[in-house]
Amino acid sequence: MSPMNVDAIRDFCLAFPGATEKLQWGDDLCFKIGGKIFAMAGLDNPRLCFKCTPETFAELIEREDIHPAPYVGRYKWVMLDRLDAVRWDELQELIRVSYEMVAAKAPRKKFRKKGSASKRTRLKRKRA
């Protein structure tokens, strides 16, 4: 059984390392990594946007209730008009890929946990 609701999506997105949330543009709950959005869920309107690969984008927009996301569709973001437009297990995989794609381009120091030393700092400590 799939939990297909904003709370389940929120829990899933915030489980990723360094993921944060911020309410933006009225009722959009944005999930971010390093200050960059990897998924957006509507609180008042059950919709979801996320980034995907060009191949997945082409396949998804052929489905009912899925289309290029407004303003960012040209960057291969899709919008699901209904949270149940895809199966829960498929949605989890799509969000995971979005997170990984955005995290790969996000500045590392923005999502490094406080208190964790950089590689350079650890090397200096070993030599001292």
PLM regions and their residue ranges:
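Charge-dense, helix-prone N-terminal extensions
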Residues: 1-128
